[in-house]
Amino acid sequence: MQIRRAKPGDVDDVVSLVESAYRGESSRVGWTTEADLLDGQRTDPDEVVSVLDDLIVAEDDSGLVGCCTLIPRDGHAYFGMFAVRPGLQGGGVGSQLLAEAERLAAEHGAGHVEMTVISTRTELIDFYLRRGYVDTGETRPFPYGDDRFGRPRRDDLAFTVLVKQL
């Protein structure tokens, strides 16, 4: 597996990868599905293009197998758009990609990595806690009414903020 910065030619494949990992029936193959929480899209080409400079992809001979964004902020990096091809989840791709993102963040001077996870996704939060992230106790509101993030099937969604010191 090779991990690299995304290129403009990756946009459509990234959209397909993210959608397959989080939305619809195909996402149920993996454990990151949000199909019971949200309908609609998870991302679109415009969003991917807007973060292209901060997008990291993992690929093997079959194509893209994972992606994430690592967005520089004041003294830290924000980790997001994390997706692994559903059939490969649980096989180490995500752990390798996360470790590389953390390495890059430290290399570029970030003191910590921050991310947000839907609060009801306890298995996902546990994944990050096992990798050294800490629940800050802070929550952020879910963007209800903004279909770019999907159409909620519940009215109790919020984000938990996780941080890992580098």
Residue ranges and their predicted role:
Residues Q2-S16:
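A short beta-loop-alpha structural element at the N-terminal edge
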Residues V57, G63-I71, H76-A83:
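Conserved beta-strand in the GNAT
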Residues F82-Q89, V117-S119:
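A short, internal acetyl-CoA/4′-phosphopantetheine-binding micro-motif in the GNAT/acyltransferase core
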Residues G111-I125, R131-L166:
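C-terminal "cap" of GNAT-fold acetyltransferases
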